[in-house]
Swiss-Prot record, chain A:
InterPro entries: Longin-like_dom_sf, Sedlin
Subcellular location(s) of the protein: Cytoplasm, Perinuclear region; Endoplasmic reticulum; Golgi apparatus
Pfam families in UniProt: Sedlin_N (PF04628)
Primary role: May play a role in vesicular transport from endoplasmic reticulum to Golgi.
Cellular compartments per GO CC: cytoplasm; endoplasmic reticulum; Golgi apparatus; nucleus; perinuclear region of cytoplasm; TRAPP complex
Quaternary assembly: Part of the multisubunit TRAPP (transport protein particle) complex.
Name of protein: Trafficking protein particle complex subunit 2
Alphabetic keyword roster: Cytoplasm, Endoplasmic reticulum, ER-Golgi transport, Golgi apparatus, Transport
Domain of life: Eukaryota
SUPFAM superfamilies tied to this protein: SNARE-like
Protein family per UniProt: Belongs to the TRAPP small subunits family. Sedlin subfamily.
Keyword Transport carried by entry: yes
Predominant localisation class: cytoplasm
Amino acid sequence: MSTFTFLIIGKNDNPLYEIEFPITVQKKETYVLQYIAHGSLDIVEEHVWKSNNMYLKIIDKFNKVQISSFVTAGHIKFLLLHEKKDEDAIKNFFVEVHDLYLKILLNPFYEYNKPITSTAFDAKVRKIGTKYF
Amino acid sequence: MSDPLSNPTINTTNVGGQTTTQNTIGGVGGGKSNSVGTPYTTPLQTSAYTTANSLSATNSPIPNHHMINSNSSNNLSGMVTPGGAGLQQQQSSITSSTNNLGLLGQQQPQQQQQQTLLQPFTTQSRLISASCFEFFYIEMIDCIMKSSSDKQQAHKKLDKLGFKVGHRLVERLSLDTALFPELLDAVKFICKVFWTTVFKKTIDGLKTNHKGGVFVLTDSKFQWLQHLSFDSSASNKDCSEYVQFTAGLIKGAMSNFGFKCIVTFDIQQVSTCVFTIKIES
């Protein structure tokens, strides 16, 4: 069964949020996935200033794992690590999560570029994740 | 001539087989139906059907004479209520030409009216009263000025506040647009989309020195200065604190796009503001 890891990376390459679908990934594997995501940040940075699109599609591959990326106007990076290639589902997932992220951002009690601790946000992302993956 | 507020007129219209009594007081109608299912709806209650997405007075459910720059009437005909009667709101005793139910006092064919009721209700955006916002803005600046030890500290606070608002607001506005790798595209976005959202008008002039990274934005009728009055005998007519927040807005918006900049401004004549954006290399 293929797993999906979704990460939100801040402006200074600091992690803001992380989730896995389904939640059965072993600890050891989690570190490997974080390492892969970290390695792809430079590639995202290169693509951002070349492309006009927020959705950057698949930007990197590591063994079987593919990395899709989405960058908001404020240069917050959404990364999705996946094995199956389903671009429509991934794009729709990113768009819906972007909408959720905006709602969090417009909350005056949320400090910009700080980790997202909202349980409501977490629950909604899980719901969107199960809908598409 | 009698005062319109002292003599409320009551008009009765037959809508889809039901009699609807409409009280029009001073040109603002509150629909009242004698059918059991239809609730009494005041103009302000209609806002439950709409969504907020801007910072201006246009289309606000509050009557026009309480607004600044408001020139459109709120047409609520065709909205179906539980009792089946269409609600209608008149503003300043002028009936909109697009109004399907026509003048309240006139009888219209039942067939035509029933067609009107079957049309889907198109939601109009609920917007903020510009006068309310401006009063709030003046009070906010007054509060910050009083709580600060000197003018420089107050300006820093306003700049920081504007930065936060601009940073978040521009993220929301650029939801459906592409990224801006080019500096000029980002500035154009601020001049058109961003300025229109905040002030309901685009920037009047944009001059660029692209190589030097300098952009000069001119607003000849800066909305937040237009309604300020000065004591004619006063020697000091400095009102820079009312513009500092906007400089912060621009700085926050540019920062969100990934361009660090310094924003300065100059107030010319009564309400002409010139903002200078200098990109930090």
